[in-house]
């Protein structure tokens, strides 16, 4: 079955011919990518395949050397992460960038504190909004006033995601969201990704864990040596085929991205 047969009209994010070079190293070469509303796309590939570079371009950290980027049908040029955030692109990095000594509310609103006259932080409003966004994700915490250091890995990941979508996020980028997590915590994070999709958000997940990928992703996009090596419906492919695309074992299909 062709992938286009079940896609809704118009991708939320569309990249065309994205290339990026760092000195003599060609990180990306002519990569196309589309992500639709209410879709989870897994970005997989070996180390050095270009996954992180592609996500950093989407997040506004790096500008592409060549290529076009469209969001909701509009061509955009991102001059930095603030531009990406303004378009509704949120990023959850592998290190989460949380402050262990601050509580959940303070982490959620760090740098974007809600204030009331005369320029005083509105602690009650922030706590109320924190509880609301965590409830939409079905995240259970002992309290929103406990320090981040007191939370489990899965709970910390949930707080990082809640912070990312606080506001008007439409696309969430997640870098290795289940890395170094135990079984129960991994299950919690995967359920969180599914809930993001159910709420209509688009999610791009970088992962080396194919078991997690096959559990939550609608599509799997494979990069190899900076080039697109596969664009596969999860339900219609196998781990063996994905690994073959990642490693180049099936060279006849490496350039035949569906």
Task: Locate the predicted segments by residue.
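Glycine-rich phosphate-binding loops of nucleotide-dependent enzymes
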Residues: 2-258
